[in-house]
Amino acid sequence: DVYKRQELIQKILKIRDKILNADDLTKYQVEIKDLEREITLFHFKAVNKCLELSKSDVDLIGFHGQTIFHAPEKKITKQLGDGLLLSQLTKKKVIYNFRQNDLENGGQGAPLAPIFHNALANELNKKFNLGFPMNILNIGGISNVTSTIEYNNLGLEEKIYACDIGPGNCLIDEWMRKNSKKGYDKEGLVARSGKTDKLILNQALDNFTEQSNFEKSLDIKNFDIFFAKGLSLEDGAATITDFTAKLISNGMNFIHNKNNSQKSKWLVCGGGRKNKYLLESIKSNFDDINLNSIDQYELDGDFIESQAFAFLAIR
């Protein structure tokens, strides 16, 4: 299963790179369909293990799939995962195509987790008296934030603000894949052993224009590691991690200004919360910031996103 997972990851990365700037996905249809079936069967094995434990308790399945293309300006997004096939295999109702449905209804297709984050903020406040504003920062491939200014169970816009704010793990992971045999920088140890090239970092930040208003969803194709070309593995990892941290920090400052509070709490989920160097770099951009892993509050930060899609599926 571990081998199969790695094989699928490589296939996903390959097709994603191939269609990165495509205007039409139809010419890749056969390749996409074949890979989609493989991914669905792989998911079925995992889902089936859960069903074996409590099949009668499962009413439906929320199936997101693997994103390989996202172009909200064209109202096109593609996640690999066949909901109909998964439904046939599990004999359960499967809710899927979350992002395409959002695009067709006037949304950006991302982020979609804020409704769940908002409900989670209320539960965390009840249990731990954390208070508001409360911000949930998800550092996945892309970083997004949900700011619950004041809890409202209807999720009214003036009480909650959410947006993509920058890269998360995508650039760091890409650098590691292309320059080493590792798929990611565990705990940021490679970056920590390197030295940031300040000149290259500042030039990259000056040239980056995707963060002007935080009103559109972001995709990996909005970012590039080209600026670090020629650096050593360690120095490149450090420079790219600090670049990522600065963009995330810019987004956090935007949220601070939006909710008129510099003292709001930040709870971090997603794989990026395990990158200690990244979190330290984010903190270094603030005089004082309350930034903690969501795991400190009896939750598992690896599963917030998957729980969000179960929540959305029920709704």
Predicted segments with their positions:
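Short, small-residue-biased leader/transition segments that mark boundaries at the very start
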Residues: 2-3
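Short beta-strand-loop/turn "lid" adjacent to the catalytic site in phosphate-handling enzymes
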Residues: 26-81
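Active-site neighborhood for divalent-cation/phosphate handling
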Residues: 62-125
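A contiguous, well-structured pocket-lining segment that forms one wall/lid of small-molecule binding clefts
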Residues: 181-264, 275-289
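Glycine-rich phosphate-binding/hydrolytic loop that grips phosphoryl groups
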Residues: 242, 292-315
